[in-house]
């Protein structure tokens, strides 16, 4: 750094980026890590820069970047993985509607359009796992289906677009057909093949949730949205398969535990009647999302939703919400605050 920058620039940059003579990077994965390695980072994020310091920082960054460009670039990993994109899709959709960030919802829609266009074969209900430079592989993994089913359901509940729910149903059917064990229940991690000695079932939620945990939770939500019994049947059978594992080592499957809790009681169904593109309808959708209520699904009144929702209509020309459990519903309302109150967990008063 000192050889690239002037003395004044280096005096500013070295402490600002946390550079030390012995290095600030510790490689705990290597028995003999290389010494003196520094990873440039903002050492004090709370520090406020003066005007001259901001100008100095801009100059420093330009010089360091120009020097970096002269080095041989590392290989670029720019493949698209469906499983990871499913997790991102769900996060963007849910955060976008809760935080009222249209750009995040737009990014979620673009994600959905790309994957369903490039990596989905509707004729065979096949979801491919990897895409790069216009080519997709033939690998079939449960995590791709389960994670993208999860993400699609989050996007549907954020937008109430019936085409997204239709896709989710097809994806769930493809996942069950390709991975579900009809004899012992549960989902295999991959498709069978001549070079595969046996098909395993994952049983650990790590940095990425296991395919079985994600599949169970997503199927339970899909069953609540559509009232298709087969999805709940498959999910409950899988929960029973993992009951011993969850009992003996609950920390191994936290998402499976969350799915079991969801299955244990009738979820709220927040049915929003109205055009999802209108601002007044979006306010009701956001209100339904804004309360922490894990036992809840949000659905519209068109498309392949559960039959009762199809009978619910807007009242007096206004978007209307119906919060239901089982066969009973609260009085219909167009007031976002009333939706929040209806969904708020018992024993937790309004802030």
PLM regions and their residue ranges:
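Glycan-recognition and catalytic cores of secretory/periplasmic carbohydrate-active enzymes
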Residues: 2-351
């Amino acid at each position: 750094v000192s050889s690239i920058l002037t003395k004044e620039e280096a005096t500013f940059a070295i402490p600002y980026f946390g550079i030390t003579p012995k290095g600030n990077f510790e490689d705990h994965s290597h028995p003999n890590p290389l010494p003196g390695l520094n990873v440039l980072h903002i050492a004090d994020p709370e520090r406020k820069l003066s005007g001259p310091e901001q100008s100095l920082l801009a100059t420093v960054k330009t010089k360091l970047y120009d020097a970096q460009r002269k080095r041989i670039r590392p290989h670029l990993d720019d493949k698209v993985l469906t499983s990871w994109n499913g997790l991102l899709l769900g996060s963007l959709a849910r955060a976008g509607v809760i935080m009222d960030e249209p750009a995040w919802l737009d990014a979620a829609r673009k994600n959905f359009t790309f994957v369903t266009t490039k990596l989905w074969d509707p004729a065979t209900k096949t979801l491919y796992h990897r895409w790069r430079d216009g080519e997709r592989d033939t690998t079939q993994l449960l995590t791709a289906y389960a994670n993208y089913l999860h993400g699609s359901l989050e996007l549907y509940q954020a937008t109430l677009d019936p085409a997204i729910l239709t896709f989710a149903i097809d994806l769930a059917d493809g996942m069950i057909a390709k991975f579900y064990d009809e004899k012992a229940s549960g989902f295999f991690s991959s498709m069978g093949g001549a070079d595969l000695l046996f098909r395993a079932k994952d049983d650990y939620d790590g940095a990425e949730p296991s395919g079985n945990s994600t599949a169970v939770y997503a199927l339970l939500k899909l069953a609540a949205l559509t009232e298709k019994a087969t999805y709940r049947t498959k999910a409950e059978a899988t929960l029973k398969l993992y009951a011993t594992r969850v009992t003996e080592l609950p920390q191994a499957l936290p998402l499976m535990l969350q799915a079991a809790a969801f299955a244990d009681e009738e979820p709220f169904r927040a049915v929003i009647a109205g055009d999802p593109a209108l601002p007044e309808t979006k306010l009701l959708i956001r209100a339904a999302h804004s309360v922490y209520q894990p036992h809840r699904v949000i659905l519209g009144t068109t498309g392949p939703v559960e039959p009762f929702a199809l009978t619910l209509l807007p009242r007096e020309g206004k978007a209307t919400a119906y919060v239901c459990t089982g066969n009973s519903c609260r009085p219909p309302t167009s007031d976002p605050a009333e939706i929040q109150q209806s969904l708020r967990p018992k024993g937790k008063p309004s802030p």
